[in-house]
Amino acid sequence: MKIGILAVQGDVEEHEYAVKKAMDELGISGDVARVKRIDDLRGLSGIIIPGGESTSIWRLTSKSNLMNALRDEVSNGLPAMGTCAGAIFMAREVKDRIMGETGQGVLGIMNISVVRNFYGRQRESFETTLNIEGIGTVRAVFIRAPAIVKYWGSAKPLVAYGDNYPVVIENNMLALTFHPELTTILVHEWFISNLVKK
């Protein structure tokens, strides 16, 4: 098993640690690889698109065509987990809480609508406890977090928080609007056990 982590910007090391620890807990032998170029997508069993600054990540990857290649791989069945900015990239619809339409580049592969900076800026970041279907109770850290405000088709929420959905699954894709890598390995274990190992 080989799990890739899009390693342009964001919580790359934290995800690496969480994946390695999850593999150990599950008794799985595997590798974690940083994905920076199209060639790095070869041979992956799954990929994680971490949080970070979504516009910067898109800008840094658009010239190399990496995002187009990633879109093709995930559309063809590569299991993918997107956290925070990663959820923004996976969404078919994206708006900003203040600016509205942004024209931001996205993969557009998941039947979800995301609002960037839903809770506000950095100072409105917060933590809460979520009981996620199939995963369990986790401490969720929301940092300048987006919100999934709508889902359709085969997309299914695994938990609701007020009027939005912090975790949504659709086929081979899992989108989270918080940062599981900061507090738990339960989400990474679930991703590996239920989507990657399928």
UniProtKB/Swiss-Prot annotation:
One Pfam family per UniProt: SNO
Pathways involved: Cofactor biosynthesis; pyridoxal 5'-phosphate biosynthesis
Residues passing through the membrane, by range: none
Catalysed reactions listed for this entry: aldehydo-D-ribose 5-phosphate + D-glyceraldehyde 3-phosphate + L-glutamine = pyridoxal 5'-phosphate + L-glutamate + phosphate + 3 H2O + H(+); L-glutamine + H2O = L-glutamate + NH4(+)
Binding site for L-glutamine: G52, E53, S54, R116, I143, R144
CDD domains (UniProt xref): GATase1_PB (cd01749)
Its job: Catalyzes the hydrolysis of glutamine to glutamate and ammonia as part of the biosynthesis of pyridoxal 5'-phosphate. The resulting ammonia molecule is channeled to the active site of PdxS.
Protein name: Pyridoxal 5'-phosphate synthase subunit PdxT
Natural source organism: Caldivirga maquilingensis (strain ATCC 700844 / DSM 13496 / JCM 10307 / IC-167)
Species classification: Archaea, Thermoproteota, Thermoprotei, Thermoproteales, Thermoproteaceae
